[in-house]
Amino acid sequence: MSKIITCEQDSNGHPDKICDQIADAIVTDILQHDKNARVAIECLLKKSQLFIAGEVTTDYRPNYQQIVHDVFNRIGAEKLGWNLTELLRIGILVDKQSPDIALGVDKGGAGDQGIMYGYATNETAEQMPIPYMVATKFLQLLKNHPSKMFRADAKAQVSYDYDTGRITTFLCSVQHSPDVEVSDFRHIIESMMVLAACEYGLDGDFTKLVNPTGRFVLGGSYADCGVTGRKLACDTYGGIGRMGGGALSGKDPTKVDRSAAYMARKIAKDIVQAGYADKCEVQLAYAIGVVQPVGVSVECFGTEHQSLDFIEAYVHDSYDLTPQGIIKRLGLLDVDYNKVSAYGHFGKAGLPWEE
């Protein structure tokens, strides 16, 4: 039986990803004004009603309305298909972080318990799974396409045969204007599918599924409710490699759901870059209020070129895995999280955990 693995990605106009972008825009804005702030933000979007809730501890007062409008403007009101300035209604319920949690975080402990994973593979220059990168590349091409027939909501899914090194099926669902000419629409979409595959040295001989229901006019938050933190596969490795129990977006880096996931990725990538293994998965585990991780493990799936004992000793000797050590090494208080809230947190140039 062939080893066919499937990865997925969503566009920045998908309602869940809109919520992630708003949450991370709030995190970035607050940290730019207060490096000591604690931020945990969740968003829910349905039709033109947005609800922002969470815990924020800071003396700075963010302009939530302006932040939200900036996010929608970046996505594009025309692509969203509705006038957000006239229609958008925002509800806000934000309180301070629990003092019981702050007791542990203030002394440098983890902001919560949890497990986090990082993954890397040498199959692409980005050290990411090839079907994930192809799906992501397709949606980036779609986002930048000048045609007005394309709307903001879209999803892509790529099935890849690791035995033959070929894509077997490329699926996409792309929201479009109601007056679209189906033949023109399909031709452009299929051309972008092939172009995305060619970017990674693959041919265009695969099954192409474009809007299998036949129509995708009603989309975004008018078709589906959006919620922060629901697209973990899209945010991480597309479904290859395990994921931790917590989402990344909407959290300041004292939350190890975010910071430890970035460090685990860096460690896995460093191991692959050093030639110690062809692919690597790192697990980190933390207890709330405890400074050191309670667990560190490395899995190389039999691809290691050094012993696992050597690799584990390398990790132990090379990385400060305390929350504050991670924040300092990766400069996480200065990251613009708007850069990672859509099209993935990993495999992008210019991010400290990718360097």
Where are the regions a protein language model picked out?
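N-terminal, positively charged regions that mediate nucleic acid binding
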Residues: 1-40, 45-46
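Alpha-helical support elements that line or immediately flank enzyme active sites
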Residues: 12-31, 120-140, 253-275
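Glycine-rich, mobile lid/loop segments that gate access to catalytic sites or pores
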Residues: 6-9, 66, 70-219, 339-342, ...
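Short, charge-patterned binding micro-sites
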Residues: 40-58, 288-292
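Short connector loops/turns at beta-strand edges and beta->alpha or beta->beta junctions
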Residues: 2, 46, 121-122, 237-243
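Internal helix-turn-beta structural module
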Residues: 3, 46, 279, 283-355
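Glycine-rich anion/phosphate-binding loop at the beta-strand->alpha-helix junction
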Residues: 179-271
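A short glycine-rich, hydrophobically flanked beta-strand micro-motif that places a catalytic Asp/Glu
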Residues: 37-41, 150-160, 206-210, 276-287
